[in-house]
Amino acid sequence: MLDYDKEAERYDISRGGEPRAAAAAEGVLGLVPVQARSLLDVACGTGIVTRRLAAGRPGLRVTGVDRAPAMARYAAARLPGAVVLADGRRLPFQDAEFDVVSSVWLLHLVEDPVDTRRIVAECARVLSPGGTYVTTVDKGASHNVGSDIDVVLASRPRRPASDTDALVESYAVGCGLVPAGQARFPGRGQGRSPRRAIADLRRGWFVTLPPGHPLADDFAARLAALPDQDRPRPDPAFTLRAFRKPVPGSFLAG
């Protein structure tokens, strides 16, 4: 996995910057009930999306949390007084404290299924009855846009995805949440060129091909042989799922 303290300085510019953040925030807010008054953004990173969540819904109190100190510092500069340094597996908040909890581009990073379930359970715990949990799913699959780069990388070693739609739904339902909608948004500025794919490979972006892996040079050579080395291929499209916490005694609560 990438070192997100080292990654913080170049995180935004390497991942589509403000256009991608705007698309992500719009997607999340489209699943947030109009009556919501508080939102917790788990794994807020540099706060580039979190800030737009706050700006995009007047009256919504937004709090960010991230476990990487460097990321949290960037986020705190964007949202003074509203960012907490903490691990998503052990959120330092009371039960039922937030009307909405979001986790954008988080669950795909978690290698241990036990930890994935713990994160979803924590998000459910701090969610108020009637509240909504919004999270990205199938992040890795979203980057497969059918390009020539994807053809080259199709045979690379893979680990099982930790954020498949079915898995995340099973974790959410296991915590007492119920499905409440979905949305898609474009990953603007994230269409890879072959040259960019090689750079990502060299710095460990593909976790099963870390720098120094015996196969890394072979994949780099195959990417270097592709035409139009600097032409970005199509942007990915990311998927959001929403889950609601039933109000006790309501129809949805059974």
Per-range role (PLM):
Residues M1-A36, I48-R52, M71-Y74, T132-S162, ...:
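Conserved class I S-adenosyl-L-methionine
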Residues S38-V42, T46-R90:
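Class I SAM-dependent methyltransferase SAM/SAH-binding core
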Residues S102:
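A conserved beta-strand element that flanks and buttresses the S-adenosyl-L-methionine
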Residues W105-L109:
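Short catalytic micro-motifs in class I SAM-dependent methyltransferases
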Residues R117-P129:
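A short glycine-rich, Lys/Arg-flanked "PGG" loop and its adjoining helix->strand segment in the class I
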Residues P160-G176:
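Short alpha-helix
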Residues V178-G254:
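Conserved Class I S-adenosyl-L-methionine
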